[in-house]
Amino acid sequence: MLSTLIKKMFGSRNERTLRRMEKSVMAINAFEPKMQALSNEELAGKTQEFKERFNNGESLDELLAEAFATVREVSLRTLGLRHFDVQLIGGMVLHEGNIAEMRTGEGKTLVATLPAYLNAISGRGVHIVTVNDYLAKRDSQWMRPIYEFLGLTVGVIYPDMSHKEKQEAYKADIVYGTNNEYGFDYLRDNMAFSLTDKVQRELNFAIVDEVDSILIDEARTPLIISGAAEDSSELYIKINSLIPQLKKQEEEGDEGDYTVDEKQKQAHLTDAGHLHIEELLTKAKLLDPGESLYHASNIMLMHHVNAALKAHAMFHRDIDYIVKDNQVVIVDEHTGRTMPGRRWSEGLHQAVEAKEGVPIQNENQTLASITFQNFFRMYNKLSGMTGTADTEAYEFQQIYNLEVVVIPTNRSMIRKDEADLVYLTQADKFQAIIEDVRECGVRRQPVLVGTVSIEASEFLSQLLKKENIKHQVLNAKFHEKEAQIIAEAGRPGAVTIATNMAGRGTDIVLGGSLAADLANLPADASEQEKEAVKKEWQKRHDEVIAAGGLRIIGSERHESRRIDNQLRGRAGRQGDPGSSRFYLSLEDNLMRIFASERVASMMRRLGMQPGEPIEHSLVTRAIENAQRKLEGHHFDVRKQLLDYDNVANDQRQVIYTQRSSIMAMTDTQEVVEMMREEVMDSLVDTYIPPQSLEDQWDPQALSDVLSDEFKIKAPVPDWIDKDHSIQPEQIKEKILALAIEHYDEKVRKVGRPVISQFEKSIILQTLDNHWREHLAAMDQLRQGIHLRGYAQKDPKQEYKKEAFSLFTMMLDNLKYEVIRILSSVEIQTEEDAQVVEEQRRADQIRKMNLMHESLSENDEASETQTFRRQEKKIGRNDPCPCGSGKKYKACHGSLV
């Protein structure tokens, strides 16, 4: 009540922001006549003038009006495009580090040039983030004339660039690239061997296009760089053959071996299922008779069973993935694109490969990872733009501290959004869609039919073929033809079926794409030929407008209202006419899981018959409530991911900062000396505990460890025999002196510069190995930490405590290992040090898998180099080589 009253008196926050910015628009417009009067040389010279004024103390905010006016005039002269007033407001929103919600067709690509130019004046760089490589290349080429006219350099990054090309690209004032590529480059930079190997500079200012897709839809899955772990293909194949023998429990209380939770996308074994799978595993000789699957020694077996169960119960061909060229290729649920190279982790991808009978690729070991949430929050300033952000404004504010400002359209939006029609069955729904498409065809109105899966798009395509309705299919299987299909989607009578339109990044122009038509002309085409093409396009354009503009048909509601709005937003661009309607059925996933009972009872009360639709605001509200519930659930998942990743992020920052400082050092002597002192102190404390009696000391064991591990001859028992009053601190001093003397001998042999090079290589190599193992330990901790809730403990607090303990242990082990190697390895020449460095590089420069929910179509993961053991592999049921008499899996094998 009070908030409504305040809004009436003062306007909403959005209205107040727009009013404030309108004053700045007036100031920019006041500069326009001055800019028009300047020659090209004078206009280009403005950049140098702005840089000097900035260096002399003027802020970017003070330069904004004149800089924006400069960009607008240059854009008009180079591209023939003049920024509208609403685009200037969008540019200001981005410059202030917020999100501009701008409808489809309002020129977001052009808007980005304003804040990009202004912030590039500081010389600290600007990153413009797109959802795929095609858009990064297209937008950088399209906007390049503006930047280059003004004396700025433009770079574009994409996966198959050479290291040198990428370094050059990042040096540019303004860089275009995908979210994945920026993130992976950051991780790769923190696995680099020297500062000169790094490609990125400071993360200064990012402008994220389709910000909702990148910062929300893709936030649940981290970016991961991984290498191949051990081959266990046979185990996947054996377990895969057992899963079809399990029976699904349809209803609670029914018999069955496993249950499926579609909301959480999980499959769980029932009590009967546990017994059944143990029986099957025993028959397959994977489990000893009478042994439990839950025994500590069978953790890996349980992991394989869970992965196989999930692969069979939850992941479906042509919905979650496709099989292409004998490989399982994931389909991104948000964009409908295939993701070559992206792989599910936790052994799930291998389980799906076993299910489909394609070659099984090795499991992956995480080498480095980060979430987009933590990556983008590292930028000094972050902003974004999209057509649909307002529904997620709370999440943007909570997680990224970004305000959403809804920018008014340049022309009034006249698209007609019709109420949803709900049918009892999918068959009725699809029949109604066919009728709607046919009616549009009669009046030559172009239609875009949106589906949520490849399966649905292909099913609909089959129905249209039966009715002899010509159409194009745009889904993950045919994205190579994407630009061509989109260019023709606005032609009179065109019918296009498209899986999720999020992130397509190309406008559907009524009448078809004039630019595409002109591009098809020969290079030496005359002006008359060009005019003829333009006239033909204008005729088609007018015909489509007369038919009602683009018709949008949604074949199913998405889990997120925002994705539905993105589909609708394809029509009605820049004041064009258009219409949209969603056709639903009670058999649709969203309705079936969340809203079917309520809507079904409503339909029964209204006496609905098969084939008849219901169109009612109550139904629409019930559907939107279901979507809100799901959006809330996904927000909680993302928030929880962030809470856990924040712990790992603090550790990541420490490691990466330390790594960079070590790479920057020319002399590592001080670091090694500090490590040596800590390691020797800790070693003495282990065998001669502080505040302990002499009877509790174990001087011989201490001497043995020093000799065996560090090649230091320290007769500790003799020291104690000669001086019974000797204190632990004195022993520490003696041991440290011997350790220094032992190491100084090595330094004298080869010289300090060679030793420093060797030290740096060993520290970085050991750090990388221990960090990799630590990431695996953190993953395992994360997997089981929720069980602490059953013991009335807060899992997040427990995770923080245990993660800190693991991190401390990792650092201690790291120091111990570095000093052990440095003390025990003999270095004869400078070549020896270089060999170690080359081995380290070879070890890490194996080709890595890059994994994320939305790798673009070009991001193909390379093959990984697999380690082959020389000796025979120890079987799980073989005697443990340690001599304990136990089976390997119950002894040292339980740690593997």
From Swiss-Prot:
One of its GO terms (cellular component) is cell envelope Sec protein transport complex. Its main location: membrane. Residues 853-879 are annotated as: Disordered. It is found in: Cell inner membrane; Cytoplasm. One of its GO terms (biological process) is intracellular protein transmembrane transport. SUPFAM superfamilies: Helical scaffold and wing domains of SecA, P-loop containing nucleoside triphosphate hydrolases, Pre-protein crosslinking domain of SecA. It is a peripheral membrane protein. It catalyses: ATP + H2O + cellular proteinSide 1 = ADP + phosphate + cellular proteinSide 2. It is an enzyme of class 7 (translocase). Its cofactor is Zn(2+). Zn(2+) binds at residues 880, 882, 891-892. Keywords: ATP-binding, Cell inner membrane, Cell membrane, Cytoplasm, Membrane, Metal-binding, Nucleotide-binding, Protein transport, Translocase, Translocation, Transport, Zinc. Its EC number is 7.4.2.8. GO terms for molecular function: ATP binding; metal ion binding; protein-exporting ATPase activity. PROSITE patterns: SECA, SECA_MOTOR_DEAD. CDD domains: DEXDc_SecA (cd17928), SF2_C_secA (cd18803). Gene3D superfamilies: Helical scaffold and wing domains of SecA, P-loop containing nucleotide triphosphate hydrolases, SecA, preprotein cross-linking domain. May bind 1 zinc ion per subunit. InterPro entries: Helicase_ATP-bd, Helicase_C-like, P-loop_NTPase, SEC_C_motif, SecA, SecA_CS, SecA_DEAD, SecA_motor_DEAD. Disulfide bonds: none annotated. The keyword Membrane applies. Residues 866-876 have a biased composition (Basic and acidic residues). ATP binds at residues 87, 105-109, 507. PANTHER family: CHLOROPLAST PROTEIN-TRANSPORTING ATPASE, SECA INNER MEMBRANE COMPONENT OF SEC PROTEIN SECRETION SYSTEM. Monomer and homodimer. Part of the essential Sec protein translocation apparatus which comprises SecA, SecYEG and auxiliary proteins SecDF-YajC and YidC. This is Protein translocase subunit SecA.
